[in-house]
Amino acid sequence: MAARTVAVAAALAVLLIFAASSATVAMAGRPTPTTSLDEEAAQAAAQSEIGGGCKEGEGEEECLARRTLTAHTDYIYTQQHHN
């Protein structure tokens, strides 16, 4: 009876060690991202608003054309991140 108890305790210890080591290995393979895609998109939008403003002496149509081109280009290059 004592031998069986020791064997069960040893088996449980081995399983516990195996479970603890596999959890550590699984977490090591998945580093946490430093920024999310939403944060990157927000930063890009803020940057384009800063640089996308109308310049002095520029007509409203030219400004609108530049903003539209910027928006379309941004959509084209960020489309793959959303699919």
UniProtKB/Swiss-Prot annotation:
Propeptide span(s): 29-74, 80-83
Localisation per UniProt entry: Secreted
Chain positions with Sulfotyrosine modification: Y75, Y77
Listed InterPro entries: Phytosulfokine
UniProt KW keywords: Developmental protein, Differentiation, Growth factor, Secreted, Signal, Sulfation
One BP term from GO: cell differentiation
Post-translational modification (record): Sulfation is important for activity and for the binding to a putative membrane receptor.
GO cellular component, as recorded: extracellular region
Signal peptide boundaries: 1-28
Main location: secreted
Gene Ontology MF terms: growth factor activity
Described purpose of this protein according to its UniProt entry: Promotes plant cell differentiation, organogenesis and somatic embryogenesis as well as cell proliferation.
Protein family according to the UniProt entry: Belongs to the phytosulfokine family.
Name of the molecule in the record: Phytosulfokines 4
Gene expressing this chain: PSK4
